[in-house]
């Protein structure tokens, strides 16, 4: 049984929902065991609460050393000025021991994101790739095999770099059905690749 981790940071719940869809997609592939975890919040609870953060997320927090236990990891983060959120960056910066030991070499990695109005989604995903490449991971995107990825009939996130959702300037927009389809497919796509490598 191949093991897949969906690891995310979500402040307002958009990436949490996308992560659930990614995990659902991965679970649809026989031969994989999927775990959903989040990176710890680095803001003091009072500050996060005042900012309107969603603090009641069901996924348990992960520890950096756990990454070595999985055959593939799908990372989810909101966009912060075209980069990953600081909480995710902080988590990844604690993986130096895994890098030294080569614990992540050859494992699959994929990234999904959210933005306010669409700007920065692709650079957020590619901002991950430097770290993943240094770890020797195999980077997986979102191929143009789904009609939803080419459908421009409504605003939506997502590109061949990875699934994405547009939250709106005030954060009120939730992931759309098409965005969730893309997220689910990304999870399934990674799972199929992992199973093939047996």
Swiss-Prot record:
InterPro entries tied to this protein: Flavodoxin/NO_synth (IPR008254), Flavoprotein-like_sf (IPR029039), Flavoprotein_WrbA-like (IPR010089), FMN_Rdtase-like_dom (IPR005025), NQO (IPR037513)
Cofactor note: Binds 1 FMN per monomer.
Residues given in the record as FMN binding sites: 10-15, 79-81, 114-119, 134
All residue ranges annotated as the Flavodoxin-like domain in the record: 4-190
Gene3D superfamilies: 3.40.50.360
Annotated catalysed reactions: a quinone + NADH + H(+) = a quinol + NAD(+); a quinone + NADPH + H(+) = a quinol + NADP(+)
Cofactors required: FMN
Matches recorded under PROSITE patterns: FLAVODOXIN_LIKE (PS50902)
GO molecular function term, any single one: NADP binding
Keywords assigned: Flavoprotein, FMN, NAD, NADP, Nucleotide-binding, Oxidoreductase
Protein name: NAD(P)H dehydrogenase (quinone)
Upper taxonomic lineage: Bacteria, Pseudomonadati, Pseudomonadota, Gammaproteobacteria, Pseudomonadales
